[in-house]
Amino acid sequence: MSRLFTIKLISNTKDSLVYDIWDEDRNEYVNQIEVSKKDFSYHLKSNQKLSNSYESSAFRAIKRAISMNVAPKEYSDGWG
């Protein structure tokens, strides 16, 4: 079974990007993540550490976006 996550841009400032993370297969909100553009540190709204594949995949996608100096309004990817 394949799994699909979507991140939706909430905020783009000079210091960070904030995205909502969604489980697209179930159409469920997973969490919100803020990632620093300077050092890739992150803060999750409801957890202290990345705790599932949706959060870790979203974090990797956001780090790639920051490295490319972009902030997509929405991005989806999956695995499985």
Q: Across the structure, where does each feature detected by a protein language model lie?
A:
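N-terminal acidic leader/helix
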Residues: 3-33
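Acidic, low-complexity intrinsically disordered segments
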Residues: 28-80
